[in-house]
């Protein structure tokens, strides 16, 4: 990566750069010549992050950076990413299905369904709002709540639509427990609710009625 983006770099500079990035992600520089099979899953994830940050990018795209990691290692990796983001003054777009990761890491949130942003705002607005998109509500409903005695979670019914044959109207309507007739034919507009935007006819209706 350094060879590719920094032409003319000397061997000594390359070695120093590799050692610096390893130390930055918590891996001893002495392990720079080891092979992938000699590292744990968490360390491999740290190495990938080190490679991504080696050339000091202004924007880091992190697609499911904690997949297949246990909870303890996941927390360590997220803390490290937050620290490096501040230290290197790098913006980060995190792609994840895990709302716990979102709560720990993100300032702003955009929730997508079938290739479309259906809700966006600050993390605080999304997590604390009294009104959310039905799909967002479904995501929150599928998270275990340790304060309640619930034997089964509440998964979202149905399946994702075929991206080559998206439904008319709201793309979520055939899975939505609050679906209205116009949801089946009319694409919903983005409506501002508090500090965030929701693409939902129900949000539009409630906003017009002054209920939210």
Label the predicted regions:
Residues 120-212:
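Short catalytic/signature loops enriched in Gly
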Residues 1, 5, 12-30, 137-141:
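Conserved ABC ATPase "signature" region
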Residues 54-58:
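A short, proline-enriched helix->beta-strand linker immediately N-terminal to the Walker B motif
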Residues 35-39, 43:
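Conserved ABC ATPase signature
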Residues 2, 61, 65, 69-151:
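P-loop NTP-binding/switch modules centered on Walker-like glycine-rich loops
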Residues 33-35, 151:
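Interfacial catalytic loop of ABC nucleotide-binding domains
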């Amino acid at each position: 990566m350094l060879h590719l983006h920094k032409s003319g770099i000397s061997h000594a500079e390359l070695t120093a750069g590799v050692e610096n990035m390893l130390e930055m992600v918590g891996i001893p520089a002495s392990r720079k010549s080891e092979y992938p099979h000699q590292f744990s899953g968490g360390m491999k994830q740290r190495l990938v992050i080190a490679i991504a940050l080696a050339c000091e990018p202004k924007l880091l795209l992190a697609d499911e950076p904690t997949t297949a990691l246990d909870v303890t290692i996941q927390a360590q990796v997220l803390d490290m990413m937050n620290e490096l983001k501040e230290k290197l003054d790098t913006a980060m777009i995190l792609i994840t299905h895990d709302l716990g990761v979102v709560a720990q890491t993100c300032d702003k949130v955009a929730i997508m369904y079938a290739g479309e942003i259906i809700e966006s705002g600050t993390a605080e607005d999304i997590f604390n709002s009294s009104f959310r998109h039905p799909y967002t509500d479904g995501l929150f409903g599928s998270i275990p709540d340790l304060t309640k005695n619930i034997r089964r979670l509440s998964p979202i019914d149905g399946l994702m639509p075929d991206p080559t044959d998206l439904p008319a109207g709201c793309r979520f309507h055939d899975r939505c427990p609050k679906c209205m007739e116009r949801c089946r034919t009319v694409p919903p507009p983005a409506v501002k609710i508090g500090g965030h935007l929701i693409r939902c006819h129900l949000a539009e209706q409630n906003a017009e009625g002054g209920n939210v």
